[in-house]
Amino acid sequence: MAVSAPPVISATSSSAGVPGGLFRAEPLYSSPGEPPRLTPNMINSFMANNHNGSVLGGGIGGGSGGSSNTNTNECRMVDMHGVKVASFLMDGQELICLPQVFDLFLKHLVGGLHTVYTKLKRLDISPVVCTVEQVRILRGLGAIQPGVNRCKLITRKDFETLFTDCTNARRKRQMTRKQAVNSSRPGRPPKRSLGVLQDNARLLPHAVPGLLSPGLITPTGITAAAMAEAMKLQKMKLMAMNTLQGNGSQNGTESEPDDLNSTTGGSESSWDKDKIQSPLAASGPQHGIAHAALAGQPGLGGAPTLNPLQQNHLLSNRLDLPFMMMPHPLLPVSLPPASVAMAMNQMNHLNTIANMAAAAQIHSPLSRAGASVIKERIPESPSPAPSLEESHRPGSQTSSHPSSSVSSSPSQMDHHSERMVMMPNNREELIVDQDNGQSIKKFQRDNKEEVPAQIPVMKSPLDKIQLAPGQALHPGFPGPFIFADSLSSVETLLTNIQGLLKVALDNARIQEKQIQQEKKELRIELFREREIRENLERQLAVELQSRSTMQKRLKKEKKAKRKLQEALEFESKRREQVEQALKQATSGDSGLRMLKDSGIPDIEIENSGTPHDSAAMQGGNYYCLAMAQQLCSA
């Protein structure tokens, strides 16, 4: 599947019903929320190697990828308000990617994508759901974020209606807030007092060049922190300029504010300029952006071209794909790092490109450099590349190009006629003077005259500026660059952060293991305590049962003892009675003896009834003997 690139559509043709000053065909500055863009020529050369169904960046599938209708899967790059957006042709209608245009045009107007869907329902607009192949293509191009598996398409007319509705709603909110602020009624302060000021195309002051860089502009506008950082940067820049102008005389040509804005950097991505690879490039010198691994051709004054090896290497590293957001000023646009590992991979790619650039510069002969202007080795990627070893001499009209953009206007060619390059093997610099002929001058580095300026986020480019007596910087001295050493420091910082994260992760794992071990030990101890408690409960139950048994036995013993005591008392009473009877019997025997002794015959006694008494006495004696035997046996 080949992605065709239609001709560039002018911004006026697609901006009907939209305020004219809101969008620019070539804006002076591009915020990180705005994705970089590819020119049609670059897209054609980019897709030439992938015509046979190869995968672009792991995202664009070939024509044999399971879709019967290849026309609906043909992605086109169209111009929408001066920005290249992805579109598909379905049923004769041109449909553009809704999440992409939301990030580009609607993100600063509404609260989120859910608000857009609510407005679409209210406006009776139904977007078209993308197929799997279309989502894969958009994800490969970077129109949608990695990991997104669904997307919707919308027509141009519906988008213009939606944009007009969002703009009107925002104006109403602003008017309501102004009325609330001006009114004397107490209430809640406005929600976005320091948020979005005006449209991003009209945010930047044109009187002070280089005040704001795109790394400081958030996708939703300029925040208070960004403004403070910009003012701090501008103050440091002005101090450095005053110091450098005091050490030497100024020998440059004054530039216009537009030229200064074009040379201060951070304005546009390398995809913004369609003139880089246009046929007009061969007619005269054009200060375009080249890849880090390239040098200018000796006999041509046009833009440098790409050889297939370097182009394939850069394309495999995803360094010139469009539509990628920039989540942080120091991290590249081409790959939004969802993790530290992704950022580290990107830094490794940048280091590889830096090595390639150094090798290409070392092996390039000096005789070929004398015949033409030596091009700066600035990468075409909008990301801060480590190969920006461009040195600036104050005595010549040097151009100060940032790592993200270079303006190709003719007025810039008038002010920048000399190009310089630094040789990495020694500490000398070669300056080619185009106006005075093919003469090469050597200047030794003077470390005493270097003016370092510390910038909070990145190293100052003033560390690489070499001064000589009687020389001064160009008036349009740009904002800070990011050189190889600053990128190495960033890489070191990211490596340290990754190490800290790894240590923190290891500590968290160790703590989690310790917690799990403690939980296991506590669980085992709890089981032991439960077992001991159950054993004690069993023993207590047995003891209670034995106690109840003993109590029952004790009651029985007490009852038996009571019965025995009662029987003993009864027997003691009987014994006393028997003893009394025996005493009475003994007393009766003594009376009989006295009668015998007195001479009374036994017959009278028997006649008087004494035999009956004697029989009773004998029975009592027998009873006493029986009771005595029972007591003895007991």
Curated annotation (Swiss-Prot):
Residues 76-162 are annotated as: DACHbox-N. Expressed in embryo, and at lower levels in the newborn. Residues 244-269 have a biased composition (Polar residues). Disulfide bonds: none annotated. Signal peptide: none annotated. Keywords: Coiled coil, Developmental protein, DNA-binding, Nucleus, Repressor, Transcription, Transcription regulation. Transmembrane segments: none annotated. Residues 488-568 are annotated as: DACHbox-C. CDD domains: DHD_Dac. One of its GO terms (biological process) is development of primary female sexual characteristics. GO terms for cellular component: nucleus. GO terms for molecular function: DNA binding. It comes from the Eukaryota. Residues 494-588 form a coiled coil. InterPro entries: Dachshund_domain (IPR052417), DNA-bd_dom_put_sf (IPR009061), SKI/SNO/DAC (IPR003380), Ski_DNA-bd_sf (IPR037000). Residues 396-412 have a biased composition (Low complexity). Residues 171-194, 244-286, 378-416 are annotated as: Disordered. Its main location: nucleus. The DACHbox-N domain forms a structure containing a DNA binding motif similar to that of the forkhead/winged helix domain. Belongs to the DACH/dachshund family. Transcription factor that is involved in regulation of organogenesis. Seems to be a regulator for SIX1 and SIX6. Seems to act as a corepressor of SIX6 in regulating proliferation by directly repressing cyclin-dependent kinase inhibitors, including the p27Kip1 promoter. Is recruited with SIX6 to the p27Kip1 promoter in embryonal retina. SIX6 corepression also seems to involve NCOR1, TBL1, HDAC1 and HDAC3. May be involved together with PAX3, SIX1, and EYA2 in regulation of myogenesis. PANTHER family: DACHSHUND (PTHR12577), DACHSHUND HOMOLOG 2 (PTHR12577:SF7). This is Dachshund homolog 2.
